[in-house]
Amino acid sequence: ASYKVKLITPDGPIEFNCPDDVYILDRAEEEGHDLPYSCRAGACSSCAGKIVDGSVDQSDNSFLDDDQIGGGFVLTCVAYPKSNVTIETHKEEALVG
């Protein structure tokens, strides 16, 4: 399956379709969008975003705790879309600040 992903960035929203077996960050880059990242392994907060609507599978994440995930935070480098999803990007400061 493939889902519509909408990323709300400081430069404005971007939308693309993302298969459910491709990480959202990887697909965004394939579409030509620059997003923040560091480790690409779900072990830091550089790529953090916040889910506005929809759901993801980020079971490869090792950084976020259950409370942060419950609060809507997502690591885009290890997030597969599980529905049409809207995510606010560039949320590292909100997460760790």
Curated annotation (Swiss-Prot):
| Alphabetized Gene3D superfamilies for the sequence | 3.10.20.30
Q: Which PROSITE patterns match?
A: 2FE2S_FER_1, 2FE2S_FER_2
Q: How is the cofactor bound?
A: Binds 1 [2Fe-2S] cluster.
Q: Does the entry feature the keyword Magnesium, yes or no?
A: no
Q: Which UniProt keywords apply?
A: 2Fe-2S, Chloroplast, Electron transport, Iron, Iron-sulfur, Metal-binding, Plastid, Transport
Tell me where in this chain the 2Fe-2S ferredoxin-type domain is found: 3-93
Q: Which Pfam families match?
A: Fer2 (PF00111)
**Residues reported to bind [2Fe-2S] cluster:** C39, C44, C47, C77
Q: What does this protein do?
A: Ferredoxins are iron-sulfur proteins that transfer electrons in a wide variety of metabolic reactions.
UniProt name for this protein: Ferredoxin
Q: Which organism is it from?
A: Solanum lasiocarpum
